[in-house]
Amino acid sequence: MGLFGLTRFIHEHKLVKPSIISTPPGVLTPVAVDVWNVMYTLLERLYPVGKRENLHGPSVTIHCLGVLLRLLTQRSYYPIFVLERCTDGPLSRGAKAIMSRAMNHDERGTSDLTRVLLSSNTSCSIKYNKTSETYDSVFRNSSTSCIPSEENKSQDMFLDGCPRQTDKTICLRDQNVCSLTSTMPSRGHPNHRLYHKLCASLIRWMGYAYVEAVDIEADEACANLFHTRTVALVYTTDTDLLFMGCDILLDAIPMFAPVVRCRDLLQYLGITYPEFLVAFVRCQTDLHTSDNLKSVQQVIQDTGLKVPHQMDTSTRSPTYDSWRHGEVFKSLTVATSGKTENGVSVSKYASNRSEVTVDASWALNLLPPSSSPLDNLERAFVEHIIAVVTPLTRGRLKLMKRVNIMQNTADPYMVINTLYHNLKGEKMARQYARIFKQFIPTPLPLNTVLTKYWN
């Protein structure tokens, strides 16, 4: 997930900065929350692998969600939750979709191109069907609803395919869920996963703003919220968001939350955003296999980038065959204050008002000519990223379509009903609901928060 080795790189080079509280009292900072990324991160922290035996799955899910909402409230963050698609159909956009189409290509009578993609000596090429991607195609409104019918709401919506456990549950007290002995045999440890539909239902009925990413990946929806100036940060540990030019919030637990800004990373590397796309697309884990995947540190060494901590050791590797045309990266080693080939100053990214992705389309001019299936995949992915992060030009206007944000009116009855069907006990459900009401205030309307923050 993300760029291989980028998380280690940003920590080793101290690119993770504590967030500075700059909003006045009463003004909330809107953040996009990659729900499943954050929830599973909390699951790993609250319930280490050795302590997950005999746990009640719904209680663990409710506990993690309660901790998340409490943290966001304490840090004055206003979350817009990005929910992953609930359908079983394939994704239509993104790295996984591009890779899937290439692997299923049947141009030469075979549907398995794994051998072709992994072979470095093959001369076979894949004809990727290029599409003119715009926000109308990438972020189109979907008619698919994640809310099941009324007759299935009491069963499928809350069970999420997992067997029910015993009703001996212990309520959430002091952010702890006690262990529970299950009377059913374990089948693949179902309690080691979160109950996705339960979590999504609680988010809806508690009145939080949310986005349903139906046929796109959640990180693309988060990037759209960031580049449309809807949110100030994206709460996730997925470094793909940095690749998409976003600023990410890694953890909401510390008082001064750690933040990584894309402009700081670009300024540290001394390159522009188009050069960043071209150089580090080889590090994308969803697009490459272990045989052709490169780490961030390997790309820095092979392309000759001179970061501040390696000014006297970084040299270009003559054996790096994937970058056959070295002249493409002449601009990668220029000083931070200098100009690049396309006349864009790297130093402009130091400004808080700068938009790092404004010249993203220049990356297509920096890409070397495609001569292998892997080159075609990388070009297709870069084209897709450009379509996600850049606006659509209409004459003198530049328009960027925002994903559809929904917000239901808070319904305490439906919250209790959702808890009741998962906990099989009205008393326990009301106890959970009372704790939510006591520690987590009802969310404000989305437009009110956005107006106060951005104005």
From Swiss-Prot:
Keywords: Decay of host mRNAs by virus, Endonuclease, Eukaryotic host gene expression shutoff by virus, Host gene expression shutoff by virus, Host mRNA suppression by virus, Host-virus interaction, Hydrolase, Nuclease, RNA-binding, Virion. One of its GO terms (cellular component) is virion component. One of its GO terms (molecular function) is RNA binding. Its main location: virion. It is found in: Virion. Minor structural protein that acts as an endoribonuclease during lytic infection. Degrades host mRNAs in the cytoplasm by cutting them at preferred sites, including some in regions of translation initiation. This is Virion host shutoff protein. It comes from Varicella-zoster virus (strain Dumas). The gene is 17.
